[in-house]
């Protein structure tokens, strides 16, 4: 792994000064790097591929240059023994029920991307503010191993607009990047060029994290929710009046959401609102609601956490916040959407806002097992490994060439290139940024 890390760092330096923007379906490099190979690999390995697409002007696509990828193209390969098992890293909004220690996860920030493999963190993209955590602010155009986590095994990551958050297997939270919004949780509103541990405000280990462009959340093993970051009167932190000395502009240290009267298992941070999910599948939310992103039937927002009235008795297994819209996945595999629909992100064949959670009819005949939201786009993965996307397609972030800039209904994303030779594939995870996306695809020999 050390030799591989050295090769990739050299590879990064070769391309980091490139300023040519290309429009293509693939990256500049014909050979896809291998970021992980299982010990004692057999002759019939399983390949897990990382794909990217959309706008990559800051290197967030990981192809080595500034480019636009109109459809999914490989970034890296991970090789596993045919008998080796792994699980997905904890994803914001998704209840983590797997106890496996070998985890793989992805996350898209505004203009940067990350991949976790068995405790290691690979990160790339725009470096302004120190969001990559390498001690400087240079952009990185290919996946680069962050050596500062060699002593801390990473469980999962959540990338924000100008900052990054990581959770270790020991239950510690690390943040780095731009600190002007207070989203780092370090008391002072300054940038951090390298990962820094958030001082404990909680009594036990952290089990889940989430972040947006300006606020961050963490859940303890006992189900208590802590939040910090920017607050502009919308109530996104859920802390209410008298939350701290700097309550007018937010809170730069973690504070317990005392008004949330039930233990929660997962959390997702939207543009100006927050959603949390209990182990029993009950959805709570709070914050801004001018676009009906809380799904309560009116546009009255506020800091006080409340359950969604129309979802009483409905068991939710995953939630996903967009900039101004929300998604929820039911136990039966149905996708519900509500909030702002101006970019088609609700998947309802309309641009109208939706006041309450409504099933996406175009996916009604499919069983969905995973959902994701970007700023104004959405995605769903079926139990058969198909990927469907909808919403804002201006920067090709839906991965399907030829779409209108606003795609109001789900379209299937294909994964066929000359090198694939039409091998069977199964999408297992997706993350969406502002104008790009990543996914993990399992390929059979």
UniProtKB/Swiss-Prot annotation:
InterPro entries the UniProt entry points to: RCC1/BLIP-II, Reg_chr_condens, Ub_ligase/GEF_domain
Free-text disruption phenotype from the record: Delayed development including late seed germination and cotyledon greening as well as delayed flowering time, short roots and mildly curled rosette leaves in long-day conditions, thus leading to extended life span. Reduced root length is associated with a smaller size of the root apical meristem (RAM) due to a decreased cortical cell number. Reduced mitochondrial complex I abundance and activity. Lower levels of complex I subunits NAD9 and FRO1, but induced expression of the alternative oxidase (AOX).
Regarding tissue, the record states: Mostly expressed in roots and rosette leaves of young seedlings, and, to a lower extent, in the flowers and siliques of mature plants. Preferentially expressed in the vascular tissues.
Q: Which GO terms describe its cellular component?
A: mitochondrion
Name the keywords, alphabetized.
Abscisic acid signaling pathway, DNA damage, Mitochondrion, mRNA processing, mRNA splicing, Repeat, Transit peptide
Enumerate the Gene Ontology biological process terms.
Answer: abscisic acid-activated signaling pathway; DNA damage response; mitochondrial respiratory chain complex I assembly; mRNA processing; negative regulation of abscisic acid-activated signaling pathway; response to methyl methanesulfonate; RNA splicing; vegetative to reproductive phase transition of meristem
**Localization:** Mitochondrion
> Which conditions up-regulate this protein?
Reduced by methyl methanesulfonate (MMS) treatment.
Q: Where are RCC1 repeat segments found?
A: 47-101, 118-169, 171-221, 222-279, 280-331, 333-383, 385-442
- Asked if the record carries the keyword Zinc, the reply is no
Q: Where is the transit peptide?
A: 1-22
Superkingdom of origin: Eukaryota
Q: How does it assemble?
A: Interacts with ATM.
What exactly does this protein do?
Regulates DNA damage response (DDR) synergistically with ATM. Together with ATM, involved in the splicing of the ND2/NAD2 mRNA. Required for the accumulation of mitochondrial respiratory chain complex I. Negative regulator of plant responses to abscisic acid (ABA). May have a pivotal role in vegetative growth and the phase transition from vegetative to reproductive growth.
From the Swiss-Prot or TrEMBL record, give the protein name. Answer: RCC1 domain-containing protein RUG3, mitochondrial
Organism, as annotated: Arabidopsis thaliana
């Amino acid at each position: 792994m050390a030799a591989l890390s050295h090769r990739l760092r050299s590879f990064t330096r070769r391309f980091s000064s490139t300023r040519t923007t290309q429009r293509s379906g693939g990256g500049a490099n014909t050979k896809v790097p291998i970021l992980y190979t299982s010990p004692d690999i057999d002759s019939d390995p399983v390949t897990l591929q990382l794909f990217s697409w959309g706008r990559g002007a800051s290197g967030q696509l990981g192809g080595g240059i500034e480019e636009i990828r109109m459809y999914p193209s490989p970034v890296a390969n991970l090789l596993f023994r045919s008998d080796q098992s792994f699980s997905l890293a904890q994803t914001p909004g998704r209840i983590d029920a797997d106890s496996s220690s070998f985890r793989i996860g992805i996350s898209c920030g505004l203009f940067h991307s990350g991949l976790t493999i068995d405790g290691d963190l690979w990160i790339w993209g725009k470096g302004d503010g120190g969001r990559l955590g390498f001690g400087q602010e240079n952009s990185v155009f290919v996946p680069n191993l962050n050596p500062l986590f060699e002593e801390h095994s990473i469980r999962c990551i959540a990338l924000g607009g100008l900052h990054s958050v990581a959770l270790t297997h020991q239950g510690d939270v690390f943040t780095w990047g731009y600190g002007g919004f207070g989203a780092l949780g370090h008391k002072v509103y300054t940038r951090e060029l390298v990962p820094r541990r958030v001082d404990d405000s909680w009594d036990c280990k952290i089990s889940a994290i989430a972040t947006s462009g300006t606020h961050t959340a963490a859940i303890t093993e006992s189900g208590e929710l802590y939040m910090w970051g920017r607050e502009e009167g919308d109530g996104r932190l859920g802390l209410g009046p008298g939350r701290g000395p700097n309550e007018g502009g937010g809170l730069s240290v973690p504070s317990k959401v005392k008004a949330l009267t039930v233990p929660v298992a997962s959390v997702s941070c939207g543009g100006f609102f927050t959603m949390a999910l209990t182990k029993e599948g009950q959805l709570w939310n709070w914050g801004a609601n001018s676009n009906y992103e809380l799904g309560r039937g009116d546009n009255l927002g506020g800091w006080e956490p409340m359950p969604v009235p129309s979802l009483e008795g409905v068991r939710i297994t995953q939630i996903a916040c967009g900039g101004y819209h929300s998604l929820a996945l039911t136990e039966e595999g149905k996708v519900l959407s509500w909030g702002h629909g101006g970019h088609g992100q609700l998947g309802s064949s309309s641009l109208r806002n939706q006041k309450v959670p409504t099933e996406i009819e175009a996916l009604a005949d499919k069983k969905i097992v995973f959902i994701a939201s970007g700023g104004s786009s959405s995605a769903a993965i079926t139990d058969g490994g198909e990927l469907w996307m909808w919403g804002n397609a201006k920067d090709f972030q839906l991965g399907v060439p030829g779409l209108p800039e606003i795609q109001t209904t789900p379209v299937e994303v294909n994964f066929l290139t000359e090198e694939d030779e039409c091998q069977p594939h199964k999408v297992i995870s997706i993350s969406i940024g502002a104008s790009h996306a990543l996914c993990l695809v399992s390929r059979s020999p």
